[in-house]
């Protein structure tokens, strides 16, 4: 089973494709989709094209994204909400459904601590997948953690 994890962002969007076989999870591909700092419509178009390419290249069985979180800057929250809405619609059009996890759920699942910092999440992601080198940037690590969380929630599924 192939799982796509997505860490939404308006400038950078991390993604990861994992393979889940019984009790083993393997990293197939992970990367960063960089959005040019243009207007929202241009960024949404870039994001949609990138999502199309991922779905065309991989036979995805499950999709999981990080849900919205609180931020202090209302403009940032508004822009991210618009972008997430576009991302959600694109996934629904191409795939049909997706799972959502809060940052606290993801951190707790991967590290055992809901208040873990990004370096702790990155450490555990590497350990769980048997990766020795650093995974950068952290948007990519977050996308992998999202996919791992979804894989763990599908325990009975092969």
From Swiss-Prot:
State where Mg(2+) 1 binds. 7, 139
Give the primary localization class.
cytoplasm
Relate the protein's function as given in its record: The RuvA-RuvB-RuvC complex processes Holliday junction (HJ) DNA during genetic recombination and DNA repair. Endonuclease that resolves HJ intermediates. Cleaves cruciform DNA by making single-stranded nicks across the HJ at symmetrical positions within the homologous arms, yielding a 5'-phosphate and a 3'-hydroxyl group; requires a central core of homology in the junction. The consensus cleavage sequence is 5'-(A/T)TT(C/G)-3'. Cleavage occurs on the 3'-side of the TT dinucleotide at the point of strand exchange.
Provide the species name.
Campylobacter hominis (strain ATCC BAA-381 / DSM 21671 / CCUG 45161 / LMG 19568 / NCTC 13146 / CH001A)
Q: What InterPro entries does the annotation carry?
A: RNaseH-like_sf, RNaseH_sf, X-over_junc_endoDNase_Mg_BS, X-over_junc_endoDNase_RuvC
Report the record's Gene Ontology biological process terms: DNA recombination; DNA repair
Q: How is the cofactor bound?
A: Binds 2 Mg(2+) ion per subunit.
Name the protein family. Answer: Belongs to the RuvC family.
Query: Quaternary state and partners of this protein?
Result: Homodimer which binds Holliday junction (HJ) DNA. The HJ becomes 2-fold symmetrical on binding to RuvC with unstacked arms; it has a different conformation from HJ DNA in complex with RuvA. In the full resolvosome a probable DNA-RuvA(4)-RuvB(12)-RuvC(2) complex forms which resolves the HJ.
In short, the EC number is: 3.1.21.10
UniProt-listed Gene3D superfamilies:
Ribonuclease H-like superfamily/Ribonuclease H
Indicate which residues the UniProt annotation says bind Mg(2+) 2: 66
Reading the lineage from the top rank, the first entry is Bacteria
Q: Which UniProt keywords apply?
A: Cytoplasm, DNA damage, DNA recombination, DNA repair, DNA-binding, Endonuclease, Hydrolase, Magnesium, Metal-binding, Nuclease
Name of protein: Crossover junction endodeoxyribonuclease RuvC
* Cofactor section: Mg(2+)
Molecular function via GO: crossover junction DNA endonuclease activity; DNA binding; magnesium ion binding
